[in-house]
């Protein structure tokens, strides 16, 4: 069958993405293959420009948001399929065309959870968060290296960033009895790296805060307890308006903040949290939950105060933090979906 004829009868198209080449498989309404070809990445829009509107599944991954937006502009219904959801539909050995076929099969299933297409603004915001996260990791590595070098020479510093920052200048100035001139120079260089990383992190954090204040969605999210500019902007960058999740519990499950279920028959077995989905956003919600737990005097100011007070009497601190992070994530998703600020409704206590 010719490509032109195939294009006119394709009901569903699966696209396996590569750095330079995309592999296409088209299926008709009976599931038969009517299109099989590979296209250069730069020609995919022109190739599908004259194809009648159809369902297109594209492998979620590198640079797929741009391709998905371009194909959506042509009128196609484009969905990004995670590779893990397409894998069960692949038959035989793995190759690019079989992956494309698996994507075409998976995208037709109502149960397949697809990745929402991000806008340019979301990608920009996500990039800021990823750069900041990398810099924070580098700063932590530098600090740990300074501590380890000092400890090798018998100098132990109390745990905490503040104590190292306060004591390091005096150590370098006064402990030449145990630190050689070479080691002092090495640690001074590392201290300079630390300062430069601090400056870059502060600059990016300030930019994120400005963007968060300029976004209505972020401002509404920041009314949720424990949620500040970093969490709010990271959430908007990750899920947009939150319509990909039917319920708040679905968002919490996507973040991996629910127990892993291993049930059979009449036995319900719950294990540790799944830790699936967006690890960065999950970490931020956990940090927000721990900040709230540090201030028990303020618990009753929140609508979940009575629940939190009761849970604190029966749950381990880490389990309590996870449960609270789950609740905060569900509240945040509701705020995002309903496009309104969080309102704490606390029931008055009766005598």
Placement of each model-derived feature along the sequence:
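Charged, often Cys/His-bearing segments associated with DNA-binding zinc-finger transcription factors
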Residues: 1-10, 153, 341-342, 351
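Glycine/alanine-rich phosphate-binding loops at beta-alpha junctions
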Residues: 1-79, 86-88
């Amino acid at each position: 069958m010719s490509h032109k004829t195939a294009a006119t009868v394709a009901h569903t198209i699966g696209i396996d993405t590569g750095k330079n080449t995309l592999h296409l498989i088209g299926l008709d309404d009976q599931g038969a293959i009517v299109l099989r070809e590979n296209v250069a990445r730069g020609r995919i829009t022109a190739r599908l420009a004259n194809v009648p509107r159809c369902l297109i599944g594209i492998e979620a991954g590198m640079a797929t948001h741009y391709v998905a937006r371009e194909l959506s502009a042509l009128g196609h219904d484009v969905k990004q399929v995670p590779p893990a959801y397409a894998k069960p539909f692949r038959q035989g050995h793995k190759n690019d065309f079989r992956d494309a076929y698996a994507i075409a099969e998976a995208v037709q299933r109502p149960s397949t959870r697809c990745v929402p297409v991000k806008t340019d603004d979301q990608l920009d915001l996500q990039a800021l968060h990823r750069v900041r996260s990398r810099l924070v990791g580098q700063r932590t590595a530098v600090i740990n290296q300074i501590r380890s070098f000092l400890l090798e020479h018998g100098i132990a510093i109390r745990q905490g960033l503040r104590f190292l920052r306060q004591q390091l200048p005096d150590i370098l100035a006064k402990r030449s009895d145990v630190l050689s001139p070479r080691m002092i120079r090495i640690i001074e260089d590392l201290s300079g790296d630390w300062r430069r990383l601090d400056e870059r992190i502060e600059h990016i954090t300030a930019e994120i805060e400005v963007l968060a204040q300029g976004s209505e969605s972020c401002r509404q999210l920041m009314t949720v307890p424990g949620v500040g500019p970093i969490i709010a902007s990271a959430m908007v960058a990750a899920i947009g308006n939150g319509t990909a999740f039917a319920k708040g519990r679905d968002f919490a499950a996507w973040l991996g903040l629910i127990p892993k279920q291993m049930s059979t028959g009449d036995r319900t077995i719950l294990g540790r949290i799944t830790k699936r989905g967006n690890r960065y956003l999950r970490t931020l919600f956990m940090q927000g939950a721990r900040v709230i737990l540090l201030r028990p005097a303020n618990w009753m100011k929140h609508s979940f105060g009575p629940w939190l007070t009761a849970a604190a009497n029966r749950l381990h601190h880490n389990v309590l933090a996870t449960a609270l992070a789950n609740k905060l994530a569900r509240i945040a998703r509701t705020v995002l979906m309903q496009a309104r600020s969080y309102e704490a409704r606390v029931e008055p206590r009766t005598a």
